[in-house]
């Protein structure tokens, strides 16, 4: 009898040790106004079955949208975070044109946005901007079904584009150019002069003034940390999509995100944008994890929607990880300390992607030292 019990115990021990732990997986998703509750339920059930644990949902500014969709997501057993852009805001009766950022040529992001029409960035130095955002995120955080607020575009416009995007815009960004350098509005210029004694408009090459860079890092950091207080007062989490680094993030979009008081970070480790392979994903993840200590880092992975056309596709925004690369990208992320991954997006995943993904998420990854 004792021998039989010993065999049973050993069997369960061996079975338990053989079981592979599933890694946490979140995903960025856009809102579909046309879908019924039934259709959304089926979609979310399918994503849960495929291994998604949390949804970062972009549904606009209306709390009722998140109440409706959040209830469905929560009923499928997934986390529900609201993905709401921060500094990028289109025309809105609640926002005045003078609250938008101004570049080194004196052009407003409202009238003449950089790169693409939707790059209408607000200025983080304006108290009115903070009030608008605090009201927006505070109202959404009050929705019972919401687990957390997910910030995006919490930055300045790209003063330096990722290398893989240069050809798309016909640019060589080997230095900072004034038309992409923000913000030179009267408030920012006056506040910087008050704190440093320097009138930045009188400087021939502002990119050489480190205090001016730090001033703008701090503007974003202070705004984030104030918004954190708002969201935490509602007993909700707050996290953000950020550029890789934070070394690259600082140089490119003025994000010094290792100083942000968030509950988690979601760096967009989109290797194709940087003309890099999956090894780079691991290297940058290691930097990110080390920069924030014990704070969770979810490695954002950019998926190629049409793998068979990637080589012939000119637009890098249609590039991304191929099915045969996704396992390596996940492995590099997890072995270098990521708490999990975040997919951009489930809708870009092919059947071949899902097959490789399923194999990769049920593994015990050993952290690199």
Can you describe what each PLM-predicted range is?
Residues 19-43, 240-244, 304:
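Boundary/entry segment of secreted carbohydrate-active catalytic domains
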Residues 33-63, 143-148, 257-265, 332-340:
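Catalytic domains of carbohydrate-active enzymes, especially glycoside hydrolases
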Residues 9-18:
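Hydrophobic h-region of N-terminal signal peptides that target proteins for export
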Residues 23-29, 55-57, 80-84, 149-152, ...:
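Hydrophobic faces of well-ordered beta-strands that scaffold small-molecule active sites
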Residues 267-278, 295-369:
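Substrate-binding cleft of secreted/luminal carbohydrate-active enzymes
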Residues 43-47, 53-101, 211-235:
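Aromatic-lined substrate-binding rim segments of carbohydrate-active enzymes
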């Amino acid at each position: 009898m004792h021998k039989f019990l010993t065999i049973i115990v050993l069997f369960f021990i061996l079975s338990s040790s053989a079981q592979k732990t599933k890694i946490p997986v979140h995903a960025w998703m856009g809102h579909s106004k046309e879908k019924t509750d039934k259709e959304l339920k089926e979609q979310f059930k399918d994503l849960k079955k495929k291994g998604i644990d949390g949804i970062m949902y972009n549904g606009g500014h209306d709390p009722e949208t998140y109440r409706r969709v959040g209830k469905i997501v929560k009923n499928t057993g997934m986390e529900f975070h609201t993905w709401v852009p921060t500094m990028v805001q289109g025309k809105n009766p609640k926002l005045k044109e003078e609250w938008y950022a101004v570049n080194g040529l004196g052009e407003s992001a409202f009238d003449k946005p950089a790169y693409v029409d939707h790059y209408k960035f607000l200025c983080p130095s304006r108290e009115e901007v903070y009030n608008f955002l605090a009201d927006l995120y505070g109202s959404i955080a009050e929705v019972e079904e919401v687990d957390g607020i997910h910030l995006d575009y919490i930055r300045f416009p790209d003063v330096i584009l990722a290398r893989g995007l240069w050809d798309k815009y016909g640019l060589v960004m080997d230095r900072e150019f004034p038309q992409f350098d923000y913000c030179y509005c009267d408030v920012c210029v006056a506040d910087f002069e008050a704190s440093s004694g320097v009138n930045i408009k009188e400087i021939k090459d502002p990119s050489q003034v480190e205090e001016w860079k730090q001033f703008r890092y701090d503007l974003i950091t202070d705004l984030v940390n104030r918004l954190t207080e708002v969201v935490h007062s509602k007993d909700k989490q707050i996290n953000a999509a950020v550029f890789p680094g934070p070394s690259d993030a600082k140089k490119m979009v003025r994000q010094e995100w290792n100083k942000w008081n968030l509950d988690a970070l979601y760096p967009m480790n989109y290797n194709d944008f940087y003309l890099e392979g999956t090894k780079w994903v691991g290297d940058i993840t290691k930097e990110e994890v080390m920069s924030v200590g014990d704070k969770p880092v979810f490695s954002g992975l950019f998926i190629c929607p049409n793998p068979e056309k990637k080589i012939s596709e000119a637009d890098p925004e249609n590039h991304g990880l191929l099915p045969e690369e996704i396992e390596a990208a996940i492995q590099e992320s997890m072995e270098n300390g990521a708490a999990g991954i975040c997919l951009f997006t489930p809708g870009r995943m092919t059947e071949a992607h899902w097959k490789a993904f399923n194999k990769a998420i049920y593994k015990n990854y050993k952290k690199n030292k």
